[in-house]
Design a protein with these regions (language model features):
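Sec-dependent N-terminal signal peptides
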Residues: 4-13
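Acidic/histidine-rich, surface-exposed loop or edge segments in extracytoplasmic proteins
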Residues: 28, 46-54
């Protein structure tokens, strides 16, 4: 599962010279539904990267057929929605959402093909890290505001005063602790100092300057080594270590590329306008835990269906024509920047922050938007938008939402069809009918289908640090049919 996440989409630049979108390779197609396609990867991701309902959650063959029927039903519903002039499907918000999904996928393809796939890690390097890969280190840590305070802590530590004692003398309670594993994605400077053979218990590590200009210092409290004992475990760890080292090297090369790409570019904020913008934005982006939970539950489609809920952008205190910043001498008004955010939402490097920290974090987030803007232009110039995987990803999200709209429009009484059972009781015969109507337009690769093995693990897969973190749409709850008695088999 880890490998599937790190290699989001696998493509080759060799075919980017064509002017039309590439066709999907035949051996990767699981089913054709009219002019729509379900790839083998689509099937696996939709089944494994989101939580399936109880009626198809297991790994047996019957449940696997329900999964396939559900994904085909989603495509059928999307085909039916072509007959309707649906306001939301035609909305600018939905088009911006699809554009954002497309461009995020393009950047991920660019990273994978140009950097990740270009790295080769020799066996000797894997061997050097193999034993340490089973280590989990327990650390005490302090996050302090300035280097002077750090120096005082270091002086006390030289007198054998522990971080725990220092913390208790300054604050109440115990010193903060955490576990750090070799596979954790810590900054390389921290990872390198912790995971070395010469490490000792009680050793101070750091200080490290953080992105918010504070300083982190750690004290090693101990560690546990978990060796890989069986041949199977050793092989798995060997491959995981190679993958982690590949990712580390690729990320380093990628950051060098980005640094060179952005060299010479200059962003200048308009202080008065930015301060007002940041104050209003903080009320929108800084939420309590309950609000964050609700936001996650509604995260996929709210951008389309409720674009102006709690939206600071329509606040009368903001003059949308005011200059928010200049970038390379070009003026960016609040309106122009907000238009860009419709397809590339802000992503904050720091997940938890107070309002005092927000303006600085907002500056970083704005800079990251402009960085992605530049990378995206490079991707378009390279022709990545014409790769079949990009179009397939856009179609996946389009059809998932079209299917949702079909359910919303088709069910007789929105308030009367509430439960999952009531919804399925209504739509099962509807989907059965559509299977018959479209039967001659449905072709299934049964050999590929038989080869797929599913797990019964509940999981929602997300990505960190990207505008659209949810990997795949929610699983479609539209049919419980477990028969494949329609369509035809591919050759």
């Amino acid at each position: 599962m880890i490998r599937a996440l790190s290699c989001v989409i696998i493509v080759s630049f060799s075919a980017f010279s064509c002017t039309k979108p590439q066709p999907i390779p035949k051996n990767l197609v699981l089913a054709h539904v009219g002019d729509k396609t379900i790839t083998i990867q689509d099937f696996i991701r939709r089944a494994e990267y989101s939580i399936r309902p109880a009626y198809c959650r297991q790994s047996n063959y019957v449940h696997k057929k329900i999964v396939l029927n559900s994904l085909i039903a989603e495509k059928l519903a999307a085909l039916e929605m072509k007959k309707n002039e649906d306001e939301l499907l035609a909305s600018s918000h939905f088009k911006s959402f699809l554009k954002g999904r497309k461009e995020q996928a393009m950047r991920q393809v660019f990273y994978h093909d140009e950097f990740y796939d270009a790295v080769t890690i020799p066996d000797t390097e894997v061997q050097d890290h193999f034993a340490m890969a089973g280590r989990t280190i327990q650390v005490n840590y302090l996050n302090l505001p300035d280097i002077k305070t750090i120096q005082k802590i270091l002086e006390l530590s030289q007198d054998n005063v522990s971080l725990d004692s220092i913390f208790k003398s300054l604050w109440e309670g115990d010193v903060p602790t955490r576990e750090i594993r070799w596979f954790d994605r810590e900054p390389e400077v921290i990872h390198g100092q912790l995971f070395q053979k010469e490490l000792k218990k009680g050793q101070l590590v750091g200080p490290f300057k953080t992105e918010d200009n504070t300083y982190l210092i750690m004290e090693v409290d101990g560690w546990i080594d978990r060796p890989a004992l069986t041949g199977k475990d050793q092989k798995l760890r060997w491959n995981d270590v190679r993958e982690r080292l590949t990712e580390k090297t690729a990320r380093s090369h990628y950051m060098e590329y980005v640094e060179n790409l952005m060299a010479g570019n200059k962003m200048e904020l308009n202080p008065d306008v930015f301060d007002t913008y940041a104050t209003l934005a903080a009320d929108y982006y800084i939420k309590d835990d309950d609000e964050k939970k609700d936001a996650l539950n509604q995260a996929i489609w709210d951008q389309i269906e409720q674009p102006d809920v709690k939206n600071f952008k329509v606040n009368p205190e903001l003059d949308l024509t005011a200059t928010l910043f200049t970038y390379n001498g070009e003026t960016w008004t609040i309106q122009a920047f907000n238009d860009l955010l419709k397809s590339r939402p802000l992503v904050f490097r720091k997940r938890k922050m107070n309002k005092g920290e927000f303006p600085f974090q907002l500056r970083l987030a704005v800079a990251d938007v402009l960085m992605d803007f530049e990378i995206t232009q490079e991707c378009y110039e390279a022709g990545i938008d014409r790769n079949w995987t990009i179009a397939s990803n856009v179609d996946l999200w389009h059809d998932a939402y079209a299917s949702k709209r079909y359910i919303d429009v088709k069910k007789p009484d929105r308030d009367g069809v509430e439960s999952e059972k009531e919804l399925l009781d209504f739509f099962n015969p509807v989907i059965d009918s559509l299977q018959g109507v479209y039967s001659d337009k449905i072709v299934i690769n049964m050999d590929a289908f038989e080869d797929i093995e599913l797990t019964a693990t509940d999981m929602v897969v997300t990505q960190k640090g990207v505008p659209y973190p949810i990997m795949v749409p929610l699983f479609p709850i539209i049919t419980t049919d477990n028969r494949l008695d329609y369509g035809s088999k591919s050759d």
